Amino acid sequence: QTTEILLCLSPVEVASLKEGINFFRNKSTGKDYILYKNKSRLRACKNMCKHQGGLFIKDIEDLAGRSVRCTKHNWKLDVSTMKYINPPESFCQDELVVEMDENNRLLLLELNPPNPWDLQPRSPEELAFGEVQITYLTHACMDLKLGDKRMVFDPWLIGPAFARGWWLLHEPPSDWLERLCQADLIYISHLHSDHLSYPTLKKLAGRRPDIPIYVGNTERPVFWNLNQSGVQLTNINVMPFGIWQQVDKNLRFMILMDGVHPEMDTCIIVEYKGHKILNTVDCTRPNGGRLPMKVALMMSDFAGGASGFPMTFSGGKFTEEWKAQFIKTERKKLLNYKARLVKNLQPRIYCPFAGYFVESHPSDKYIKETNTKNDPNELNNLIKKNSDVITWTPRPGATLDLGRMLKDPTDSKGIIEPPEGTKIYKDSWDFEPYLEILNAAVGDEIFLHSSWIKEYFTWAGFKDYNLVVRMIETDEDFNPFPGGYDYLVDFLDLSFPKERPQREHPYEEIHSRVDVIRHVVKNGLLWDELYIGFQTRLQRDPDIYHHLFWNHFQIKLPLTPPNWKSFLMCCEQNGPGILQFSTERTNEPNRNKFSVENKA
């Protein structure tokens, strides 16, 4: 590995270091750093939030002078420990090495391992016209022709993603299934259903169950739910990170992990005859921020809006005006971040993708109107204003000829648009088959027994955390579902009290559409179906993001679903008692009393 000097302070600057937090900028690189002094001990880090790369400033609420606050999402870092304190118990900041040289200068050093893509380097060869072609299908799905091989990224081409919350914005080319069947290999970046689409893969498996599919070796396996999905795929290959995988003499690829969500997110470098294609997909900080520069083509997400925050929140600061301003500000920050990233990496060509979804179900009209997305053309114009990078806003069926574009970006045949009259945007979606699957869970025998609540949350395995959550089943419009469950879970001791405990505790209310929450519970699915799919409405007091709780239910649930067959057998043996929770509100603020009725 190599050692890089990031910042050098003169003896005078060292002598003037104050106790506590010191901010510095390297004027030659424009990079920012934080140095914390506690008597003779010094700790240092980059001034960059690990969440989404925001800049830290002094936290005026911290009278002890140990923490800094991110200007993006108000995350807080205790620089004395290098641990994030908001959200609590989440990430640790990467530290820099602090050294004094022989001239009493202070150096901030970073130890860098060699870039894996630089191993066995290959010089770019000239590409023939038509030799490398990239065709956009929809959302994050690209069809790559690489010599005599074909590779497809993240095929989501039919059905919804995240239960019923996301639907395709673009109409895929009519030959999409043929294209998938002709692929030599498929790369699926991560387990989210806008990338790992079981409805799409079911169609493909009916024709080519043995098609080679490649995924990264993430902590949460990409295909963790394959057996339960009923999709018959027989050639899934789990690859180590940072190692070239040779496809033929001209083609190889390398999968890399995300620096913020290494347990699930990946990105990929594809290289053909020395020309690199970088696809960072949804990674928040792909490969920890270390990426190849001057690749032939780079593609990444751009749109924003892939979260229930803040649209699904209410109470306190979450007024419609606050939400609108927050969303507007966040989208602008994301645009600027992506533009900076592209400027720094200097690809020859950049393509924004993986953001073309819409909340098209009529019941999600509010989300659709509120959750505005970034315009890819606005991002591309921003990039072109600050760099010489060529940009491509893709339309379904459009094909980029890499050889032509690298040789002459003005070549009219460099990008072939779909024929005149081709349908670009979807105007209808086949809702019913997918909603029927969700609705089937509502009347399942499991939910005749109120003891499913204890069974489910015991299976989930999250406890020893001071948080009380009220779960409320609702109809389409988030009104209480007639006869639905409304109950408390105290995660400190994993109990299910009739009313909130007397001790001090954070509190959340989660209103969930009954069809989705019961489908998730029955099948042991991750809560991204609820949260990212906009199937909940939330309130919290205090207004704190509980990272450990959400991270557990979004990524760390058991790999096998609850054993409901055994549960029902136990219910039969214990008698026919069928219990239902009902709620009576008291005059006491934020305190709910629960009664239990035996309905047998």
Swiss-Prot record:
GO annotations of cellular component type? cytoplasm
What this protein catalyses is: CMP-N-acetyl-beta-neuraminate + 2 Fe(II)-[cytochrome b5] + O2 + 2 H(+) = CMP-N-glycoloyl-beta-neuraminate + 2 Fe(III)-[cytochrome b5] + H2O
Sorted alphabetically, the Gene Ontology BP terms of this entry are: CMP-N-acetylneuraminate metabolic process; N-acetylneuraminate metabolic process
- Gene3D superfamilies assigned: Ribonuclease Z/Hydroxyacylglutathione hydrolase-like (3.60.15.10), Rieske [2Fe-2S] iron-sulphur domain (2.102.10.10)
What are the alphabetically sorted keywords of the record? 2Fe-2S, Cytoplasm, Electron transport, Iron, Iron-sulfur, Metal-binding, Oxidoreductase, Transport
What Enzyme Commission number(s) appear in the record?
1.14.18.2
| Organism lineage string | Eukaryota, Metazoa, Chordata, Craniata, Vertebrata
* Co-factor note (free text): Binds 1 [2Fe-2S] cluster per subunit.
**Entry function:** Sialic acids are components of carbohydrate chains of glycoconjugates and are involved in cell-cell recognition and cell-pathogen interactions. Catalyzes the conversion of CMP-N-acetylneuraminic acid (CMP-Neu5Ac) into its hydroxylated derivative CMP-N-glycolylneuraminic acid (CMP-Neu5Gc), a sialic acid abundantly expressed at the surface of many cells.
Gene name in the database record = CMAH
- The domain of life for this entry's organism is Eukaryota
Domain Rieske, by residue range, is 9-107
Q: Where does [2Fe-2S] cluster bind?
A: C49, H51, C70, H73
Q: Does the keyword Membrane apply?
A: no
Q: Which cofactor does it need?
A: [2Fe-2S] cluster
**Of which family is this protein a member?**
Belongs to the CMP-Neu5Ac hydroxylase family.
Q: Give coiled-coil spans as residue ranges.
A: none
Alphabetical list of InterPro entries matching this protein: CMP-Neu5Ac_hydroxylase_Rieske, Cnh, RibonucZ/Hydroxyglut_hydro, Rieske_2Fe-2S, Rieske_2Fe-2S_sf
What organism does the UniProt record list as the source?
Answer: Gorilla gorilla gorilla
Task: Return the Pfam families for the record.
Answer: Lactamase_B_3 (PF13483), Rieske (PF00355)
Subcellular location, record wording: Cytoplasm
Descriptive protein name: Cytidine monophosphate-N-acetylneuraminic acid hydroxylase
For this protein, what is any one GO molecular function term?
A: metal ion binding
Report the top EC class in one word.
oxidoreductase
Which pathway does the database say it acts in? Amino-sugar metabolism; N-acetylneuraminate metabolism
